[in-house]
């Protein structure tokens, strides 16, 4: 059986507890193949967020286009 494919669009959490990292773990638990497009990169841990750096819109668009031009995405999840 080929797993369904989901795309998450959101921020990257350096601590691994939120953002696309958490989304990809959830997709895996649901036996869904996860793809991602990163909107921002954070410097954070369990104590808080220290910094957020947004990616340029063109970079985000390129990530989304790359995934959608190749894979049959069945679901989309968005974050920050």
Regions found by a protein language model. Give the residues of each.
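Small-residue (G/A/S/T)-rich helix-start motifs and N-terminal tracts that mark the onset
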Residues: 1-75
């Amino acid at each position: 059986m080929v797993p369904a494919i989901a795309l998450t669009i959101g921020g990257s959490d350096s601590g691994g507890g939120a953002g696309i990292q958490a989304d990809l773990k959830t997709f895996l638990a649901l036996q869904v193949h996860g793809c991602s497009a990163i909107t921002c990169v954070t410097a954070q841990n369990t104590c808080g967020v220290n910094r957020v750096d947004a990616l340029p819109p063109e970079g985000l668009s390129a990530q989304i286009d790359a995934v959608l031009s190749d894979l049959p995405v069945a679901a989309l999840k968005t974050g920050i």
